[in-house]
Swiss-Prot record:
Expressed in fetal bone, thymus, placenta, heart, brain, and liver. This is Myosin-3. Belongs to the TRAFAC class myosin-kinesin ATPase superfamily. Myosin family. Keywords: Actin-binding, ATP-binding, Calmodulin-binding, Coiled coil, Cytoplasm, Disease variant, Methylation, Motor protein, Muscle protein, Myosin, Nucleotide-binding, Thick filament. Residues 656-678, 758-772 are annotated as: Actin-binding. Residues 86-779 form the Myosin motor domain. It is found in: Cytoplasm, Myofibril.
Length: 1940
């Protein structure tokens, strides 16, 4: 596996080739149990993943991933591979090789878009059905020169390996790409050619000198593909660009690895597609490209149209393909023809023959009257075809209809039937296209043959894979036989490689040729008396049939060959005649039509015309075709008689044998393409389909072969490292043992089957499955070891803990014992005397200790001076080292320049040598070629001379014959005509021979000239050769001298010896790439030399830097020792200071206890305290100086390290630059990269050292800072808490009052919400009532619609009854029956009525005129009825529409407000949750703060002895006052942020309440709208007034609430001021108390004589001070609470003020919106009413038409003569009626859409959605266009109705009314446009309001986020303070305990 950095070379394609290291590790660490995880056979998905639950009675219970339980047999359960094998790149390395493992590995990689996977020698690729960036130029460069194991699987890797094998092994290569149609074979073939054209491009050297060449060889190779695709690719069901032929592309390379030429061989072109396609397919692309009219000149040239349906051959399936642009593809095809050097004549012929094939499909023939013979049905198409083919049309038609057939020795004209002629035309079309395609391939090969010297080739085989269809014919047998041969070839090749691997590793192995497994099936097909042999034999017999062929197969093979079987009969499938067992499965074949397909007969008479065609291309295509006619005329053709009857199968076998012989001479590489699904869905994989292809492609066959051998192999070192844990005792510790022996001992000690593995020279080989067993054993072993280790660790930790508990217990006992003893003796008189005397005894000791401290302090100063002197010395040494470094750099640079000069001379000589050798080789080869050409020319010259002499003799003989003929001419007048014809023929022959003679003479002379020139060239080349040999000898001698010089240099610079060796090896490896790199090397030589010198300089610098680094490391260690010494000294000093402080405290205590101490002792104590303070200050100054010195040293050290780091970075950059040029030079990068890695390692070591030093220094600094911080924290906390106490107590009361007010307002809002809910329930009830009404109205509407449809039918019958009343009844009856048969089930009822009417009409023919008058009366009566019905329908429709609209509007509004209410409720809940969480956090902070205060008080009580020191530190407290003030500001800022958060919460609640108010208002508006529809507009106005009054009352209540808030705010301000005054008074009292305490302390010091009285006063003062402190703590806590409450109340007040302003603004907005909605609703209602009236008018017109129809029906029932006319006009007038019905429905739909859009506009006006308004505008424009279309349709219908105006005047009136309605609708649309514009303006205004609200919301959200951030910061600070307080408290407690 390559690292992620190595994958960066592939750019954006890296994730699609190999997953990152992190993803691979995560996948491998997934849980896995090898005993339960498995694959199981599944009926749904073939195989499914699952877990084994139980196994009993020969059945296994498995639970699948989708929680299904399956009970299967043990053989249906397959082992699953461990996670380390997931998405493995080579499936042959799977430890469990089985079908489901392969399937799921492919599937997992495919879902990750890794489409390429190795399977042993195979590369399996899955079609992704989408574009992936895995073919970009950077990917090509990434695979260039990489071995297979060095890069992820890819088609480029296969291609590059083939290319490298060709260069190194000097052996031809082949790449076999197979797969089903649509699997990606053609795309991968293109990528292979693209890769070779990129890496082996010839550039300018490959340009052909011939003027026909239009591009480089690479361009031509690439351009051949689009031309072949145009003529050989077509759309199929699976693939839009399916190759319908196989091809083998050979790309030839020269001696240097450059492209030299290429050629193409094709196989099995599907020529039947030319004349027949399935429905979902189409013919070859070239036909549709021509018809795309991208090149109009082709349309004119080929005499065709642009409509594909004019040509039956190409229009049987689909015409257009969505993924293909035929016009652009035509340009690409035409460009490819030009690039490939086709002449204009060839190009024209190519297009003409393609067009002729299209015309062939239009040729029509008919049967002669009273004969079975065919004759042409028109000659126009034949004329076009003949013109394009260069034939005579009459000859062509005659040859098709009356071909000449040879019977015996005579020719007979045979008449053809129409079917035979059509078959002949189809066969000729296919033959012309096939030969045209083959000629095109030959012509491409001629162009790609550049005559450049070529050495080896790489062949790319793109051929169809194994095919198993429901119907398999001869084509499938050929394809499957090809794959059978290829699979046999693969099996043999694969195991030969395996055998070589085993032989190289020294493993005993019996060779098994798996290629023999397929021999039986192959012999059955191709051997004598095989299937192909019998087929060809049957084709020789004229009376043979498909049945006789089948019988022969049965007789020969059924029961004798295991691979030949009789197929099973399956219902629903086509009949199959025999089955073959292939390696991929059993295939049923049908032999229908095999004999005809194999013979492939052609009309020889037409072929003869082709051979004489004036179209040179057509004549050339059939020039070698031997007809019977030609056979009788020429002797030479008789030799080729057999070839004229060459069958399709024989030709196929010949090509296949040629292909296999080519492949056997190559080293093959296999690519198998897989189609993942049938629907072309990216990322989806159908298991059954993929498994079928894996079997057909031989992938599973390859895995079967792998399982026979040892598929898993591991290097000995890797195996020992990974599996040593299985039995570590088997490998002895402490002594060297070879890895192979260690693996042998390890495997021998494990309980496994020892026949399942073998030991090679470098690897250990395993059978399939054994490696998985070892993995399971390793996992179990690791689990046991980890469990044991955990147990040992837990035991050790518990023992340590127990020891601590025991020690703690003993210490407690000791302390208790000492305390009890002390309590017993402390009241003894002698003990009291001891307490008084002992302090006096220690004074002398104290003086001694002070003296020792002074001495130590002096020593510390001396050591500091010494360290400073050492530092200066080190700085001087550093300067000298830098100077030495610069000198060494100059020296190294000079040496490296000299070395580079020598290397350059050496490289130039080596290059010159290789160039000269290559030139000598080329000259030698050219000389040999010239000699061969010279010999050939000499032979040709002799042959030409012989032919010339023979021609001369022939000419003499012909001249004699001519003289004789002239004499006989005068004598024989009867034969004059024949002789004249013979004479003219002879004249032409003489002229022809004369021309040939002249041409031969010219050729002879040219050959002589060429021979002389070639001889001169040979002589000059020989001279040049001798000169070059001399130069080579000179260069070799100079090379020897240079080698000696190089050896001398290598002795001086041994380090560079490896570099030169690698350079020489890389030069030898790059011989083949030398010509390509010559020009680039010239440009890069100078730059490379500079870089090389720089690199060598940097190497030497790196060595120097390493030395300096070591020195600096030593110096750093010394400094560390000094620092440690300083730390120890400082710790000792600190300890002494603490001891002195403790002793001082003890002295003070004892002084207090011993009240009778003299003033001299007090003065002595003061003096000692002063000295102690002085010593402490001196110590602190020394500490500061020491820290400054350490910081300076660290800075200098950091500077030097940074300088070294910069230099190392420079080296790193140079390394990276050289790595980029690695692919261009490949010379000395390996050694350079190793040196750079060493430098980078040294840099990393330096960085680690620097980091450790910095950590140590930071720790020391941190300790110092903590000591200083601990001294000042208590004082800062005291002053801060005193200032906070007063203000917080006042704020508490203000907050409580505000909270009570807010609770009252909240209750009011809750009541309003309940009222809204009640109103919503009432609306739901009203909605249900409307729904019932709507349902009943819809039912009525349906009834009326059915009546309307009946009236429409009557109208149609009327129109039919009024046409052609005087026709004969019998004729119309027959027509009526014919029409009735064609009608559908809808007319069954009409047919019965018409039959009855026809019978009535036959009886009452004479009474027609009398009943016409009655029809008129009936018509008038029906018109009245229709009008009445129309009025009812209009009413019902209007009522239904109104109810429907009400229901829709109410549902929409209700749904919208429900969603809004739910969203608001969710927001409210979220806000409440957030508020509760914030309050809990606040409460926690308060509790924590109170705990901190309690701890502080305990600390103060416990440390009362430090009061004297606190008094001395008052000055420091004053200095820190500023810091306290800043902290106070930050606290206030945090509290403000907290208030902002609370404000945001309140704003959210206010927004919720505002939304609820909106809901109330909108519901009221809805109520108004409904009442407005049901009642009058006046009532609606009153409701709006009522709504205004309600809003006014709401405003008044809000105003009163606002006034209350203002009053409460004033009250809160007053309370705040009062509490601030109280706080100031408390602070004054506290300051007085502090001053009194200070005065008391001073008084204590001044009074000496009255010590006892002063002591009593002092104790009283101290107790009073402690009481004051306790009171102060209580006040501080209360002040904090009050402060928080004040801030909350202040925020609440500000929020209330803002809410009031917002409510006022929203009230104004809502009033304006109500007015606006009112006006909009009024206008919309008017518009709706207008639309309803228009709709009713349209319906009335339709009802008029229906009345007319009913009148006409009455007339028709009474009119007998009109029945016949009605039958004739039935179909036409029903179409007209249907059109009118569609028109009516369209109009109704248009009106409904307009109503719907108006409703949406209403809603949009409420919502203010600008985008919806725009959509509405676009929709109205569409409606305008639809109305215009409907206008046109209506005018057309009016025109149609005018035809019947003469007979039905009523319909004229209706058409006029229709036009009026259309005009009214147009006016209505114009009005709607005006309305829409007004809506648009309103929407824009609403949008502006929405934007304003949105900005407010964003601002509030931003403030909330900032407040949260500030709260987090404050919380972190509080936590830090709390932690520091705890630390300080604990330290004080420890000190106190130690003092006691």
């Amino acid at each position: 596996m390559s690292s992620d950095t190595e994958m960066e070379v592939f750019g954006i394609a890296a994730p699609f080739l190999r997953k990152s290291e992190k993803e691979r590790i995560e996948a491998q660490n997934q849980p896995f149990d090898a005993k339960t995880y498995c694959f199981v056979v599944d009926s749904k998905e073939e195989y499914a993943k699952g877990k084994i639950k139980s196994s009993q009675d020969g059945k296994v219970t498995v639970e699948t991933e989708d929680n299904r339980t399956l009970v299967v047999k043990p053989e249906d359960v397959y082992a699953m591979n461990p996670p380390k094998f997931d998405r493995i790149e080579d499936m042959a390395m799977l430890t469990h090789l089985n079908e489901p493992a392969v399937l799921y590995n492919l599937k997992d990689r495919y879902t990750s878009w890794m489409i390429y996977t190795y399977s042993g020698l195979f590369c399996v690729t899955v079609n992704p059905y989408k574009w992936l960036p895995v073919y970009n130029p950077e990917v090509v460069e990434g695979y260039r020169g990489k071995k297979r194991q060095e890069a992820p699987p890819h088609i480029f890797s296969i291609s590059d390996n083939a290319y490298q094998f060709m260069l190194t092994d000097r052996e031809n290569q082949s790449i076999l790409i197979t797969g089903e149609s649509g699997a990606g074979k053609t795309v991968n073939t293109k990528r292979v050619i693209q890769y070779f054209a990129t890496i082996a491009a010839t550039g300018d050297l490959a340009k052909k000198k011939d003027s026909k060449m239009k591009g480089t060889l690479e361009d031509q190779i690439i351009s051949a593909n689009p031309l072949l695709e145009a003529f050989g690719n077509a759309k199929t069901v699976r693939n839009d660009n399916s190759s319908r032929f196989g091809k083998f592309i050979r790309i030839h390379f020269g001696t240097t690895g450059k492209l030299a030429s290429a050629d193409i061989e094709t196989y099995l072109l599907e020529k039947s597609r030319v004349t027949f396609q399935l429905k979902a397919e189409r013919s070859y692309h070239i036909f549709y490209q021509i018809l795309s009219n991208k090149k109009p000149e082709l349309i004119e040239l080929l005499l065709i149209t642009t409509n594909p349906y004019d040509y039956p051959f190409i229009s049987q399936g689909e015409i257009l393909v969505a993924s293909i642009d035929d016009a652009e593809e035509l340009l690409a095809t035409d460009s490819a023809i030009d690039i490939l050097g086709f002449t204009p004549e060839e190009k024209s012929g190519l297009y003409k023959l393609t067009g002729a094939v299209m015309h062939y499909g239009n040729m029509k023939f008919k049967q002669k009257q009273r004969e079975e013979q065919a004759e042409p049905d028109g000659t126009e198409v034949a004329d076009k075809t003949a013109y394009l083919m260069g034939l005579n049309s009459s000859d062509l038609l005659k040859a098709l209809c009356f071909p000449r057939v040879k019977v015996g020795n005579e020719y007979v004209t045979k008449g053809q039937t129409v079917d035979q002629v059509h078959h002949a035309v189809n066969a000729l079309s296919k033959s012309v296209y096939e030969k045209l395609f083959l000629w095109m391939v030959t012509r491409i090969n001629q162009q790609l043959d550049t005559k450049l010297p070529r050495q080896h080739f790489i062949g790319v085989l793109d051929i169809a894979g194994f095919e198993i269809f429901e119907y398999n014919s001869l084509e499938q047998l050929c394809i499957n036989f090809t794959n059978e041969k290829l699979q046999q070839f693969f099996n043999h090749h694969m195991f030969v490689l395996e055998q070589e691997e085993y032989k190289k590793e020294g493993i005993e192995w019996t060779f098994i040729d798996f290629g023999m497994d397929l021999a039986a099936c192959i012999e059955l097909i191709e051997k004598p008396m095989g299937i192909f042999s019998i087929l060809e034999e049957e084709c020789m017999f004229p009376k043979a049939t498909d049945t006789s062929f089948k019988n022969k197969l049965y007789d020969q093979h059924l029961g004798k060959s295991n691979n030949f079987q009789k197929p099973k009969v399956v219902k629903g499938r086509a009949e199959a005649h025999f089955s073959l067992i292939h390696y991929a499965g059993t295939v049923d074949y049908s032999v229908s039509g095999w004999l005809e397909k194999n013979k492939d007969p052609l009309n020889e008479t037409v072929v003869g015309l082709y051979q004489k065609s004036s179209n040179r291309l057509l004549a050339h295509l059939y020039a070698t075709f031997a007809t019977a006619d030609a056979d009788s005329g020429k002797k030479k053709v008789a030799k080729k008689k057999g070839s004229s009857f060459q069958t399709v199968s024989a030709l196929f076998r010949e090509n296949l044998n040629k292909l296999m012989s080519n492949l056997r001479t190559t080293h093959p590489h296999f690519v198998r393409c897989i189609i993942p699904n049938e629907t072309k869905t990216p990322g989806a994989m159908e298991h059954s389909l993929v498994l079928h292809q894996l079997r057909c492609n031989g992938v599973l066959e390859g895995i079967r072969i792998c399982r026979k051998g040892f598929p898993n192999r591991i290097l000995y070192g890797d195996f020992k490292q990974r599996y040593r844990v299985l039995n570590a005792s088997a490998i002895p510790e402490g002594q060297f043992i070879d890895s192979k022996k260690a693996c042998e001992k390890l495997l021998a000690s494990i309980d496994i089957d020892h026949t399942q593995y073998k030991f090679g020279h470098t690897k250990v080989f395993f059978k399939a499955g054994l490696l998985g067993t070892l993995e399971e054993m390793r996992d179990d072993r690791l689990a046991k070891l980890i469990t044991r280790t955990q147990a040992v660790c837990r035991g050790f930790l518990m023992r340590v803990e127990f020891q601590k508990m025991v020690q703690r217990r003993e210490s407690i006992f000791c302390i208790q014992y000492n305390i009890r003893s002390f309590m017993n003796v402390k009241h003894w008189p002698w003990m009291k005397l001891f307490f008084k005397i002992k302090p006096l005894l220690k004074s002398a000791e104290t003086e001694k200790e002070m003296a020792t401290m002074k001495e130590e302090f002096q020593k510390t100063k001396d050591e500091l001076a010494k360290s400073e002197a050492k530092r200066k010395e080190l700085e001087e040494k550093l300067v000298t080292l830098v100077q030495e470094k610069n000198d060494l750099q100059l020296q190294v640079q000079a040496e490296s320049e000299n070395l580079l000069d020598a290397e350059e001379r050496c490289d130039q000589l080596i290059k010159a040598k290789f160039q000269l050798e290559a030139k000598i080789k080329e000259v030698t080869e050219r000389a040999e070629d010239e000699e061969e050409i010279n010999a050939e020319l000499t032979a040709k010259k002799r042959k030409l001379e012989d032919e010339c002499s023979e021609l001369k003799k022939d000419i003499d003989d012909l001249e004699l014959t001519l003289a004789k003929v002239e004499k006989e001419k005068h004598a024989t007048e009867n034969k004059v005509k024949n002789l004249t014809e013979e004479l003219s023929g002879l004249d032409e022959t003489i002229a022809k021979l004369t021309r040939e003679k002249k041409a031969l003479q010219e050729a002879h002379q040219q050959a002589l000239d060429d021979l002389q020139a070639e001889e001169d060239k040979v002589n000059s080349l020989n001279k040049t050769k001798s000169k070059l040999e001399q130069q080579v000898e000179d260069l070799e001698s100079s090379l020897e001298q240079e080698k000696k010089l190089r050896v001398d240099l290598e002795r001086n610079k041994r380090k560079l010896e490896g570099d030169l060796k690698l350079a020489q090896e890389s030069i030898l490896d790059l011989e083949n790439d030398k010509q390509q790199l010559d020009e680039r090397l010239k440009k890069k030589d100078f730059e490379y030399c500079q870089l090389q010198s720089k690199v060598e300089d940097e190497q030497t610098l790196g060595l120097q830097f390493q030395k300096k680094i070591k020195e600096l490391q030593a110096r750093i260690e010394e400094l560390e020792e000094e620092i440690e010494a300083e730390r120890a000294t400082r710790a000792k000093t600190e300890k002494q200071r603490s001891d002195y402080a403790r002793e001082l405290e003890e002295l003070s205590e004892r002084l207090e206890e011993a009240g009778g101490v003299t003033s001299t002792q007090i003065e002595l104590n003061k003096k000692r305290e002063a000295e102690f303070l002085k010593l402490r200050r001196d110590l602190e100054e020394a500490t500061l100086q020491h820290e400054a010195m350490v910081a300076a040293l660290r800075k200098k050290h950091a500077d030097s390290v940074a300088e070294l780091g910069e230099q190392i970075d420079n080296l790193q950059r140079v390394k990276q630059k050289l790595e980029k040029e690695k692919s261009e030079f490949k010379l000395e990068i390996d050694d350079l990269s190793s040196s750079m890695e060493s430098v980078s390692k040294s840099k990393a070591n330096l960085e680690k050292i620097c980091r450790t030093l910095e950590d140590q220094l930071s720790e020391a600094r941190g300790k110092n800072e903590e000591i200083q911080r601990s001294l000042s924290e208590l004082t800062t906390q005291k002053s801060r808490l005193q200032t906070e106490a007063g203000e917080l107590s006042r704020q508490l009361e203000e907050k409580e009052s505000i909270v009570s007010q807010l609770s009252r307002s909240k209750q009011a809002f809750t009541q309003q919400t309940e009222e809204l809910k009640r109103q919503l329930e009432e609306e739901n009830k009203a909605k249900n009532a409307l729904a019932h009404a709507l349902q009943s109205s819809r039912h009525d509407c349906d009834l009326l619609r059915e009546q309307y449809e009946e009236e429409q039918e009557g109208k149609a019958e009327l129109q039919r009854a009024l046409s052609k009343a005087n026709s004969e009844v019998a004729q119309w009856r027959t027509k009526y029956e014919t029409d009735a048969i064609q009608r559908t089930e809808e007319l069954e009822e009409a047919k019965k009525k018409l039959a009855q009417r026809l019978q009535d009409s036959e009886e009452q023919v004479e009474a027609v005129n009398a009943k016409c008058a009655s029809l008129e009366k009936t018509k008038q009566r029906l018109q009245g009825e229709v009008e009445d019905l129309m009025v009812d329908v209009e009413r019902a429709n209007s009522l239904a529409a109104a109810l429907d609209k009400k229901q829709r509007n109410f549902d929409k509004v209700l749904a919208e407000w429900k969603t809004k209410c739910e969203e608001s409720q969710a927001e409210l809940e979220a806000s409440l949750k957030e508020s509760r969480s914030l309050s809990t956090e606040l409460f926690k902070l308060k509790n924590a703060y109170e705990e901190a205060l309690d701890q502080l008080e305990t600390v103060k009580r416990e440390n009362k002895n430090l009061e004297q020191e606190i008094a001395d530190l008052t000055e420091q407290i004053a200095e820190n006052g500023k810091t306290i003030h800043e902290l106070e500001k930050s606290r206030k800022q945090i509290e403000l942020e907290k208030a902002d958060i609370q404000l945001a919460l309140e704003e959210a609640e206010a927004a919720l309440e505002h939304e609820e108010a909106k809901i109330l208002r909108i519901q009221l508006e809805l109520t108004q709208v409904k009442s407005e529809i049901d009642r009058k507009i006046a009532e609606k106005d009153e409701e709006i007034e009522q709504l205004k009054r309600n809003y006014q009352r709401t405003v008044e209540t809000m105003q009163s609430a606002l006034d209350a808030e203002v009053r409460s705010r004033n009250e809160a301000i007053r309370l705040k001021k009062k509490m601030e005054g109280d706080l100031n008074e408390i602070e004054i009292q506290l300051s007085h108390a502090n001053r009194q305490a200070a005065e008391t302390l001073k008084h204590l010091r001044s009074v000496q004589g009255q010590l006892k009285d002063t002591q009593l006063h002092l104790d009283d003062a101290l107790r009073g001070q402690e009481d004051l402190k306790e009171q102060l703590a209580i006040v501080e806590r209360r002040a904090n609470l009050l402060q928080a409450e004040v801030e909350e109340l202040r925020a609440t007040l500000e929020q209330t003020e803002r809410a009031r302003k917002l409510a006022e603004q929203e009230l104004l907005d809502s009033n304006e919106r109500v007015q606006l909605l009112h006006t909009q609703n009024t206008s919309l209602i008017h518009t709706k009413k207008k639309l309803e009236t228009d709709l009713m008018q349209l319906q009335s017109e339709v009802e008029d038409a229906s009345r007319d129809a009913r009148n006409a029906e009455e007339k028709a029932k009474k009119a007998i003569t009109d029945a016949a006319m009605m039958a004739e006009e039935l179909k036409k007038e029903q179409d007209t009626s249907a059109h009118l019905e569609r028109m009516k429905k369209n109009l109704e739909q248009t009106v409904k859409d307009l109503q719907h859009r108006l409703d949406e506009a209403e809603q949009l006006a409420l919502k203010g959605g600008k985008k919806q308004i725009q959509k509405l505008e676009t929709r109205i424009r569409e409606l305008e266009f639809e109305l215009e279309g409907e206008q046109k349709k209506n005018t057309e219908s009016v025109k149609g109705l005018r035809k019947y105006e003469r007979r039905v005047k009523e319909l004229t009136y209706q058409s006029e009314e229709d036009r009026k309605n259309v005009l009214r609708l147009q006016d209505l649309v114009d009005k709607l446009q005006v309305k829409v514009k007004s809506y648009k303006r309103q929407a824009e205004e609403a949008d502006e309001q929405a934007n304003a609200h949105l900005t407010k919301f964003r601002k509030a959200q931003h403030e909330l986020e900032e407040a949260e951030e500030r709260a987090d910061i404050a919380e972190s600070q509080v936590n830090k303070l709390r932690a520091k307080t705890r630390d300080f408290t604990s330290s004080r407690m420890v000190v106190h305990e130690s003092e006691e």
